[in-house]
Every structure is written in C-alpha cells, then in structure tokens.
Amino acid sequence: MVALLAEHTDTRQQAGLLVRPDNHDALSVAVTATPVVTTTGTPATPPALELDVQQGDGIGKRAGLPSRKQIETWVTSALYADAALTVRFVDEEEGRALNRSYRGKDYATNVLTFAYAESEDDPVTGDIVLCCPVVETEAREQRKPLEAHYAHLIVHGVLHAQGYEHEDDAEAEEMEAIETETLQALGFEDPYRDDHTPVAH
C-alpha cells in the first residue's frame, strides 16, 4: 500500500492518494481528505464551531456550572472538524426522562449525546446533555474537582458526536486515550487515573 499526501484547497485539510493492491493484477485508488494535525494529534487550525449553551429549569441557580468560555474551550479541544453543537445542562427529572425515552433506561445518567450526522460526509451536529445532580454527585464520590469532571464529560460527548464509540474494549481504549490526552493538554489530570468514570453514549 502506498499513501501520498498533498496540499488541500482547504488549509485545514490535507489531500491524500491511497494506492493498494486489489487483486493479482489490479490496484485500487482512493482520494482522501484528513485534518491537518499537530504532533499532539489536534488539528493545526481550530475547526469552526457553532455552539449553543442551554440550561434547563432551575439550573442557573446551581453552583459550579462552567462558563460559556470554558465550555467552548473544552468542546474545541476535542473537535476534528467543523461542528454545530448544543450543550445543555439539565436537572434529574429531565435527564431521567431523556434517558428513558431514548435509551430505555429509567434513571438519570451523567451525559447523553445525540449525534445527528448520518454519514462521515455530513457536518458534525449534535446535542450534549449533562445532568447536573449526577455530575456533582460523581465528582464528589470520585474526589474530583467539579470543573474537571464537567470538562471530561463534555470532551467525551464531543467525541461521541464525531462518531467515536466504546462498544468494545478496543473502542473504549481509543476513546479513553484521546480523552486523557485532551484533558491533560487542558491542564487536567488523567480522568481514568484512579476511577473509571461511568459514561453513557
């Protein structure tokens, strides 16, 4: 297999030509486009982000909610393509109702991600819903700063919105490695250092 890289008309992408044997007397050729990344694996040019931050009933009164600037920083750190995302903070009642309706689980979970892109060619669009009481309880039980736990779950949700999953061990290891690298680059500790944070998808 031979892979050649070249400049792309979009400065955030690099064009590629992939040539590999198909049969004994044939070759398959594919043209690709991938984000230009730095040595740390993050895009060299930050993707464009359309961000909507929402709060459910009574959420504005809760202490420890991240600011819009923090949310935007955390979301962007985990993006590999332009995206339109909503980050919504909800109470236990709304979180439970969403989890019951869409996953068939009658309890509130820490984070839910609703990804709307139907193929890899579609723009990254999705909703990331965080249940504040659950996040606060987990941070306290795991002895983590609340800010760090919110950052972790938002990064986790952003990865889900881009198609990452943790259905098997290999997928889980990949996601955890990306999350750890991203959070450490943001100045947080490894979220999996002592505990495996339970996350929903």
Curated annotation (Swiss-Prot):
Cofactor (UniProt)? Zn(2+)
Q: What is its EC number?
A: 3.1.-.-
* Chief place where the protein resides: cytoplasm
Residues that span the membrane, as ranges: none
> Which cysteines bridge via disulfide bonds?
none
Record keywords: Cytoplasm, Endonuclease, Hydrolase, Metal-binding, Nuclease, Ribosome biogenesis, rRNA processing, Zinc
Task: Tell me the cofactor note.
Answer: Binds 1 zinc ion.
Chain residues that bind Zn(2+): 156, 160, 166
An example Gene Ontology CC term for this record: cytoplasm
This protein's record includes keyword Phosphoprotein = no
Whether Metal-binding counts among this entry's keywords is yes
Query: Which terms under GO biological process does the entry name?
Result: rRNA processing
A family per Pfam: YbeY
Q: Where in the cell is it found?
A: Cytoplasm
Q: Which GO terms describe its molecular function?
A: metalloendopeptidase activity; RNA endonuclease activity; zinc ion binding
UniProt function note: Single strand-specific metallo-endoribonuclease involved in late-stage 70S ribosome quality control and in maturation of the 3' terminus of the 16S rRNA.
Q: Which family does the similarity line name?
A: Belongs to the endoribonuclease YbeY family.
* PANTHER family listed in its UniProt record: ENDORIBONUCLEASE YBEY, CHLOROPLASTIC
Protein name in UniProt:
Endoribonuclease YbeY
Origin organism is: Cupriavidus pinatubonensis (strain JMP 134 / LMG 1197) (Cupriavidus necator (strain JMP 134))
Its ancestry begins with:
Bacteria, Pseudomonadati, Pseudomonadota, Betaproteobacteria, Burkholderiales
